[in-house]
Amino acid sequence: MRMVDIIIKKQNGKELTTEEIQFFVNGYTDGSIPDYQASALAMAIFFQDMSDRERADLTMAMVNSGETIDLSAIEGIKVDKHSTGGVGDTTTLVLAPLVAALDVPVAKMSGRGLGHTGGTIDKLEAIMGFHVELTKDEFIKLVNRDKVAVIGQSGNLTPADKKLYALRDVTGTVNSIPLIASSIMSKKIAAGADAIVLDVKTGAGAFMKTEEDAAELAKAMVRIGNNVGRQTMAVISDMSQPLGFAIGNALEVKEAIDTLKGEGPEDLHELVLTLGSQMVVLAKKADTLDEARAKLEEVMKNGKALEKFKDFLKNQGGDSSIVDDPSKLPQAAYQIDVPAKEAGVVSEIVADEIGVAAMLLGAGRATKEDEIDLAVGIMLRKKVGDKVEKGEPLVTLYANRENVDEVIAKVYDNIRIAAEAKAPKLIHTLITE
């Protein structure tokens, strides 16, 4: 088999066989196929697309290119949630204990964040003592006993994806549905998920700017999952403005605690219930989404979800007293209100740029080596569709330095006020097949 023949075949719009796809993935991973041939095939896929079968084969070839995590020692159906990213996305912190309170096993592998704010692990490390350095046996024991644990991404999972991802980044082939879908799904499957719930974001702060693109990506991933024996559902949700009010690590932990009590921001509360319902149904702990939702609301009300969060923190060395006393979380030295310059209705909050503003305060990383300041960030005081008076705070900056002029300028550039505006729809579509 020659790589050049595979490239020409795809260039001509023909379907590649399972063997051809495996030949490419294995050869590219072990270095016998050079970058220039891999980038030629990526470009051919970009223009000629792939069938559902090819996408499933590409996904599984990437899964099998490295180690996989075997979670079969964990009882029950392991459901994993993946978000395509966004700003102020605190859903994992709320969802993990929430669904675990209904005996859905949450065996979560999470990464650190690059960009606007930290990843889930950075957020959890805002809690004194919390660590993710668990052995595999400890991890499995905790999930079997308490239904929830988080471990750092480890091992050599999907090396083919890591290599191909870096190549796509520099060859203009990032925006290809088959390549994005197989990349995301290969990571989830290699990490041992039996079933997968996807939160595909759309809008200004999202990778997929239009609802059509988001729906196409969501359907592609759901079909891959179902074709390789992993039941998959997706939610298309809005990221034209940040989710919730908090952007920053300790601030988001506090917001997660409020949400577990049923007192969180409306949009975060709604998204968590929507995603959580799908997780509960896939884990076979409820027959319908409505039944699942009612059960989730019940464990929020009766305090079981909050207790589960405390157990989870304690199990991993964290100070669980922060749940009752969030002032023990890292605190910023300065709180600076940014007032509205005019009256009206908030018409736009550019999510990714507000994320960058939080990063300028120190809430995120520009490079892997950067240190994150867990205390700093931004609290939105208004959301799109809210009325605002002149002089009323639009946001509050939590900072550890007094001079934040460039952050204030960024806030003014990216929060717009108009005569009228409607709140955007949060949940666009549910995709189940």
Swiss-Prot record:
GO terms for biological process: pyrimidine nucleobase metabolic process; pyrimidine nucleoside metabolic process. Substrate binds at residues 168, 187. Keywords: Glycosyltransferase, Metal-binding, Potassium, Transferase. Binds 1 K(+) ion per subunit. Its cofactor is K(+). One of its GO terms (cellular component) is cytosol. This is Pyrimidine-nucleoside phosphorylase. It comes from the Bacteria. Gene3D superfamilies: Nucleoside phosphorylase/phosphoribosyltransferase catalytic domain, Pyrimidine nucleoside phosphorylase-like, C-terminal domain, Transferase, Pyrimidine Nucleoside Phosphorylase, Chain C. Belongs to the thymidine/pyrimidine-nucleoside phosphorylase family. Phosphate binds at residues 81-83, 92, 108-110, 120. SUPFAM superfamilies: Nucleoside phosphorylase/phosphoribosyltransferase catalytic domain, Nucleoside phosphorylase/phosphoribosyltransferase N-terminal domain, Pyrimidine nucleoside phosphorylase C-terminal domain. Induction: Induced by deoxyadenosine and thymidine. Repressed by DeoR and glucose. Homodimer. It comes from Bacillus subtilis (strain 168). K(+) binds at residues 88, 90, 243, 246, 255. Its EC number is 2.4.2.2. SMART domains: PYNP_C (SM00941). One of its GO terms (molecular function) is deoxyuridine phosphorylase activity. It is an enzyme of class 2 (transferase). It catalyses: uridine + phosphate = alpha-D-ribose 1-phosphate + uracil; thymidine + phosphate = 2-deoxy-alpha-D-ribose 1-phosphate + thymine; 2'-deoxyuridine + phosphate = 2-deoxy-alpha-D-ribose 1-phosphate + uracil. The gene is pdp.
